Amino acid sequence: MKVVTIKDSKKETFSNPLFTGSDVTRQVLIPDSRELVATVVNFGKGVRNKFHSHDCEQILIVTAGRGVVATEKEERPVTLGDVVLIPAGEKHWHGSVGEPFSHIYVSKSGSKLTQLED
């Protein structure tokens, strides 16, 4: 068993063309898992990711702030304690809408992300 405390996890800049701004950091929680990825993503005010999809399910667990998780059909506000299941292949985005926002994402290790928006 391994227990990780989020506040003790190293925060690093998360530069990626998937994001609409540069104020994004991440904290990899379980780097030695063979099957799962569990990472905290911290979005600065107004930063989100662009429309994308995954080839497996993704779970988001909101840990701070208020944000939005959106598909082509709807935008849902989310806040501390909300848990979101995004099915494989669903076009979506998530991020901050006016204040800093953080979530943990959990997905299958080695899964493929496809960016669907420039």
Where are these regions (language model features)?
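Short, conserved beta-strand element in jelly-roll/cupin
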Residues: 42-44, 53-69
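Short beta-strand His + acidic residue motifs that chelate non-heme Fe in jelly-roll/DSBH
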Residues: 49-51, 69-70, 91-98
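Ligand-binding loop in jelly-roll beta-barrel domains
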Residues: 88-113
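Short hydrophobic/aromatic-rich beta-strand segments that constitute the beta-sheet cores
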Residues: 26-27, 38, 69, 103
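Short acidic-glycine-tyrosine-enriched beta hairpin
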Residues: 73-88
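Conserved short histidine dyad/triad with adjacent acidic residue
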Residues: 23, 39-53, 88
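Short, charged/polar surface micro-motifs in flexible loops or helix N-caps
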Residues: 33-36, 43-47, 66, 109-112
